[in-house]
Amino acid sequence: MAFPIPARQLFIDGEWREPIKKNRIPVINPSTEEIIGDIPAATAEDVEVAVVAARRAFRRNNWSATSGAHRATYLRAIAAKITEKKDHFVKLETIDSGKPFDEAVLDIDDVASCFEYFAGQAEALDGKQKAPVTLPMERFKSHVLRQPLGVVGLISPWNYPLLMATWKIAPALAAGCTAVLKPSELASVTCLEFGEVCNEVGLPPGVLNILTGLGPDAGAPLVSHPDVDKIAFTGSSATGSKVMASAAQLVKPVTLELGGKSPIVVFEDVDIDKVVEWTIFGCFWTNGQICSATSRLLVHESIAAEFVDKLVKWTKNIKISDPFEEGCRLGPVISKGQYDKIMKFISTAKSEGATILYGGSRPEHLKKGYYIEPTIVTDISTSMQIWKEEVFGPVLCVKTFSSEDEAIALANDTEYGLAAAVFSNDLERCERITKALEVGAVWVNCSQPCFVQAPWGGIKRSGFGRELGEWGIQNYLNIKQVTQDISDEPWGWYKSP
């Protein structure tokens, strides 16, 4: 489907500005491999201009020093404007990222919902200011202020381009911070378009600045900038480590939402067809490009044969097509680089002795685009690369277990700790498994539902900190203790001269 990509510049201080070095990055439609436009390529010089604008906006009295209720009016206006322009954003997200149109619809709905939710959090912040602290000495009284951290750098990924940027923008702005957003260069179009929304609702200049560009050229200078007070990053564990190391030089706080290799544990007492659908959804949703993808299937040995047989039948029924086609449930992966990486994972699995039970190739009916069949890999050992490393593509590996203890051990056999799913009709067993799983989120009898009201984040090498919910806004607040002596009496520690 042909759809024009708007020609945009960098969004700095409420204006569209050409990059200082005037470079551009081509936008490639992953469904066709065709160049459909370009985006500006920011460098360290542009980062400097954007950070100065954000700091100036933070020091003005029309944002950070205002009430949460005042900021909430802007967040609600943004939510309304996103809803008004929903069709435009959905089309751009689909053509830029390759995700199925129906998924992009849900994403953009969630963008609006996220701004609406954090508008409420901004208002709630007003009621929490000057919260009293009970002290053991009557001559003192104490309270707590919740104040914005300052200028924050937000680095977002390409799998949910505008939505995961929103997970950072909305709470940061609700808290009263000003921000510089650096989205992934692989899918930046909707994030740039968001700058136009900011202007349309009258967001004060400099409150949000949007820089597209390559990680080393724009992301790294943002992380290391001495006038950026915090970094919130979503991306790979390897890049997250670099972000953390760079920020550490300035003792700069970071929140990191990184990779995963999440397990899905299926016990013998389940409705197999129901769980099979959740299994393919948990791994193949968003074209398999989900940090929380439950890509390690652990199924009880007593039902494994029947389960895997139905798994293949359901997987064969997935419609793989141009993302704009009605009923599309699997589109292309994001780029040629990602395509090659996934195919290398599959070939390595074969060479290590695994069986590609289904898929593993380009769909025969799609000659162009970065399409990969949904792939099921069996005969897995825990030493294999496919078991240990994040693929970030539509690849599911399958292993059996015989006992609850074995299931827990296999599920936790990973350096990651983002999410996990457990399926059983025995809810007491589900509760035991939930407590034992070393992750930040557990789905019981489902996989992947995510709500703005609930916290999101991982442990181990999946990062730290929590986005969304009431925890999301806390990432962007400084908690300040204020203690006052209310006695007329002298302190009396030293002898009076």
UniProtKB/Swiss-Prot annotation:
Residue numbers marked as site, Transition state stabilizer: 159
GO molecular function: 3-aminopropanal dehydrogenase (NAD+) activity; 4-trimethylammoniobutyraldehyde dehydrogenase activity; aminobutyraldehyde dehydrogenase (NAD+) activity; betaine-aldehyde dehydrogenase (NAD+) activity; potassium ion binding; protein homodimerization activity
Active-site annotation: 257, 291
Pathway membership, UniProt: Amine and polyamine biosynthesis; betaine biosynthesis via choline pathway; betaine from betaine aldehyde: step 1/1
Regulation: Is reversibly and partially inactivated by betaine aldehyde in the absence of NAD(+) in a time- and concentration-dependent mode.
Known catalytic reactions: 4-aminobutanal + NAD(+) + H2O = 4-aminobutanoate + NADH + 2 H(+); 3-aminopropanal + NAD(+) + H2O = beta-alanine + NADH + 2 H(+); 4-(trimethylamino)butanal + NAD(+) + H2O = 4-(trimethylamino)butanoate + NADH + 2 H(+); betaine aldehyde + NAD(+) + H2O = glycine betaine + NADH + 2 H(+)
Keywords carried by this UniProt record: Metal-binding, NAD, Oxidoreductase, Potassium
InterPro entries, sorted: Ald_DH/histidinol_DH, Ald_DH_C, Ald_DH_CS_CYS, Ald_DH_CS_GLU, Ald_DH_N, Aldehyde_DH_dom, Aldehyde_DH_NAD(P)
Binding positions (K(+) 1): 28, 96, 186
The keyword Metal-binding is assigned to this record: yes
A biological process from GO: glycine betaine biosynthetic process from choline
Keyword Acetylation: no
Induction or repression: Induced by salt stress.
Blocked amino end (Arg) modification, residue list: 8
Record EC number: 1.2.1.-, 1.2.1.47, 1.2.1.19, 1.2.1.8
Uppermost EC category: oxidoreductase
Protein family per UniProt: Belongs to the aldehyde dehydrogenase family.
Assembly description: Forms homodimers.
Additional remarks: The catalytic activity of the dimeric betaine aldehyde (BADH) from spinach does not require potassium ion as cofactor, contrary to the tetrameric BADH from Pseudomonas aeruginosa (AC Q9HTJ1), although both enzymes contain potassium-binding sites.
Designated name of the protein: Aminoaldehyde dehydrogenase BADH
